[in-house]
Amino acid sequence: MKKISRKEYVSMYGPTTGDKVRLGDTDLILEVEHDCTTYGEEIKFGGGKTIRDGMGQTNSPSSHELDLVITNALIVDYTGIYKADIGIKNGKIHGIGKAGNKDLQDGVCNRLCVGPATEALAAEGLIVTAGGIDTHIHFISPQQIPTAFASGITTMIGGGTGPADGTNATTITPGRWNLKEMLRASEEYAMNLGYLGKGNVSFEPALIDQLEAGAIGFKIHEDWGSTPSAINHALNIADKYDVQVAIHTDTLNEAGCVEDTLEAIAGRTIHTFHTEGAGGGHAPDVIKMAGEFNILPASTNPTIPFTKNTEAEHMDMLMCHHLDKNIKEDVEFADSRIRPQTIAAEDKLHDMGIFSITSSDSQAMGRVGEVITRTWQTADKNKKEFGRLPEEKGDNDNFRIKRYISKYTINPAITHGISEYVGSVEVGKYADLVLWSPAFFGIKPNMIIKGGFIALSQMGDANASIPTPQPVYYREMFGHHGKAKFDTNITFVSQVAYENGIKHELGLQRVVLPVKNCRNITKKDLKFNDVTAHIEVNPETYKVKVDGNEVTSHAADKLSLAQLYNLF
């Protein structure tokens, strides 16, 4: 067999086992763990290449003939960092491994048949990740959806009804009628969507009614009263109906302190929003909750990574919660939530795997298009400050990369009961995939595939003779249009709503699927971010200790994935 140099191989097929790739302009270096190909039998599309009739393409279609093959992709996922062909059929990932013509080529997987019906997408030199999942969405404006989508987010979970004051402050779609209208409005968008009902209710029939109306769970928010009674009732119904509860705890400690909230939770699983506290929650020590086994702790992106500007911008952001900067008590309320010491600790807690999820808090103290970027900026800042993680093996950052990608893919999927459908690059899941050039990883995707169909891509002038002439910018592709979007996007609902036929009741055309397995999980089920610990906060200095050791980080004055890539 003719041999070629590693440099030539990479230029033709992308990096292979042992090759290293830098992510964007960060210091994060991945190493390809293994390559599923058979060397010498690689498939590649194009003139003089191998995906041709009677070569890499078979003449004998089978039940495993693919609709789309993504060739030579570098997959970055909690399951591994490896090279493979990805086969898509009927909108789902049908196989991962070596694709081609089994009649002629060695090593072709049974489920990866390239045939007459197969389209090809070349991923040589590109990284493929699962679409991101943002679980802290205030549905204030529908314009958030394409903004998030263009950043690589393919699932949004939260609540709201538009720019009402309740939605500006809380991620809640309250009541049957509001849920009905939001579920109907969801039909329009290339995005998986799920809505949280109001959990601030001490009357269980009202909670059940929202689940029957299609809510995927409950949100408890201090602006509606995060009392022990509301917490207990919401969790009682969540346990009965297998849905998740998210909580923004009581900043003012009016109905109790953090210990009282933990007592009301009583060891039951709950998803804590902005667990550091600047976004809201028991002052000054809500961060203690992150160490508990039953707490699924999330950050929102204004506080990560910690920079020299973080503290200053938060006061203005806090006013969105229907506060008035001219009212002394409102200013004191806001000021109680902004603690540089706990914000500084948050970055380190992410690096330790104690904080498990990243999210946005869209237009309500967070930026909906920056979840992915902020996650990788935090990873890079922590590597620069703290060095390699002790869990790393070999001269790479693979463990840290898996830890951080899990924070916005598989872990939010597990938390909200949708990991059977989305959240990772695994066979059987919907093909919600994001393609990245390594130089732009984490900041500007090349292309987004939604339910197996291209929905958004960087695209040049439509009047040009080829696809690439300037101006190149994100443009909606066919997956965004017509009835195709009904087949390739999911509306998530509770199991009771699904079983009662809510799709037919509301005349929904999109795929409708139930959430499940929300109550039989703990933090130990979260990938690469399952660390529990005893966390303390000094009530006077706000310094944070983990298992007796102080944790903090420096405020960065420069970040990766920032001005190098953006004009504004």
Curated annotation (Swiss-Prot):
Belongs to the metallo-dependent hydrolases superfamily. Urease alpha subunit family. Heterohexamer of 3 UreA (alpha) and 3 UreB (beta) subunits. This is Urease subunit beta. It comes from Helicobacter heilmannii. Pathway: Nitrogen metabolism; urea degradation; CO(2) and NH(3) from urea (urease route): step 1/1. GO terms for molecular function: nickel cation binding; urease activity. Its EC number is 3.5.1.5. Ni(2+) 1 binds at residues 136, 138, 219, 361. Carboxylation allows a single lysine to coordinate two nickel ions. Disulfide bonds: none annotated. The keyword Cell membrane does not apply. Residues 131-568 form the Urease domain. The gene is ureB. The modification N6-carboxylysine is found at residue 219. Ni(2+) 2 binds at residues 219, 248, 274. It comes from the Bacteria.
